[in-house]
Amino acid sequence: MTTSVIVTGARTPIGKLMGSLKDFSASDLGAITIAAALKKANVAPSIVQYVIIGQVLTAGAGQMPARQAAVAAGIGWDVPALTINKMCLSGLDAIALADQLIRAGEFDVVVAGGQESMTKAPHLLMDSRSGYKYGDVTIVDHLAYDGLHDVFTNQPMGALTEQRNDVEKFTRQEQDEFAARSHQKAAAAWKDGVFADEVVPVSIPQSKGDSLQFTEDEGIRANTSAESLAGLKPAFRCGGTITPGSASQISDGAATVVVMNKEKAQQLGLTWLVEIGAHGVVAGPDSTLQSQPANAIKKAVDREGISVEQLDVVEINEAFAAVALASARELGIAPELVNVNGGAIAVGHPLGMSGARITLHVALELARRGSGYGVAALCGAGGQGDALILRAV
């Protein structure tokens, strides 16, 4: 049976909303990471056969953002590209689809990942084409409406998660403690050079003088503590338990991996980080988020023929602390063992990028350890979940 491998990958540092990457489009960022990933892999753009990129906020981004990024990165005009929108699952699903296409015999070399500029999301004048005869009109925020608002319950996803917390019974303190650990672990990882293998600097032109090199995630606050987070007001409900500190940050960034048929990689004399294993895809029974990563992981490990206890590296995207806490509890994993180098609460959550970011991070972490199983998992809007098993052998 054909096996797919992740040869290597690259990501940008993650910028805060209206932060260092505010002037870059999602495709600009994607092009940077595609070019960097190919260079790191020692793979010529000419042998790439397909490009799959996740992006959620595409209004105003121009036609085919994935193809924009591919062409700008030097991939040929004869190479097709696909833009995926599966909300927060997009970047991971792009990699999973690359694996599926390779195993199906369609391609041998696929570039896959995710890109997002939440800063560049425009405001929309809905129904303007048909005109307005009288009265006020409302301008809709593309970021909020198409990115962060649950269409099934007509409320922000944070409010939906707050409602589910009434059932899950996670306290404000538990969520604050988890969020603080995310910042502390991410800060320590940067200090220890853990992210050096995955992050490519972004050169930011200046009006005068040399370009500025943007090199580190700018949302991490090393001095964050549960005590400092305790002073924040609830974000979604009076007396609620979720605050801006226990929710993921609105951010900009991109991540790309090079996925290849293992035999092709051997023919080219390449090494690789990991083999790609089973993919778990779940949904329902409603649009809530908390259980989706756990459900997807359970499905993926079952398809892989292993147990949760055999997972050495577990990345669960921190859309909210409550999501990671709930999924860890359902899996029987201690929360401190999830996201050992911090997560989206600290580094940020560019919607289309995050699945690719955590997949790349699991791959690199397994490669550092030399063996073992890892999983990258996320919840997604509409009550869906994806998980991808990786193995270093």
Curated annotation (Swiss-Prot):
Membrane-traversing stretches: none
Active site per UniProt: C88 (acyl-thioester intermediate), H349 (proton acceptor), C379 (proton acceptor)
PROSITE patterns (UniProt xref): THIOLASE_1, THIOLASE_2, THIOLASE_3
Reactions the enzyme catalyzes: 2 acetyl-CoA = acetoacetyl-CoA + CoA
EC numbers for this chain: 2.3.1.9
Cross-referenced InterPro entries: Thiolase (IPR002155), Thiolase-like (IPR016039), Thiolase_acyl_enz_int_AS (IPR020615), Thiolase_AS (IPR020610), Thiolase_C (IPR020617), Thiolase_CS (IPR020613), Thiolase_N (IPR020616)
Keywords recorded for this protein, A-Z: Acyltransferase, Transferase
SUPFAM superfamilies hit by this protein: Thiolase-like
EC supergroup of this enzyme: transferase
Signal peptide: none
Coiled coil, from the record: none
One GO MF term attached to the UniProt entry: acetyl-CoA C-acetyltransferase activity
UniProt-listed Gene3D superfamilies: 3.40.47.10
UniProt xrefs under PANTHER family: ACETYL-COA ACETYLTRANSFERASE, CYTOSOLIC (PTHR18919:SF107), ACETYL-COA C-ACYLTRANSFERASE (PTHR18919)
Family that this chain belongs to: Belongs to the thiolase-like superfamily. Thiolase family.
Designated name of the protein: Probable acetyl-CoA acetyltransferase
Organism of this sequence: Mycobacterium leprae (strain TN)
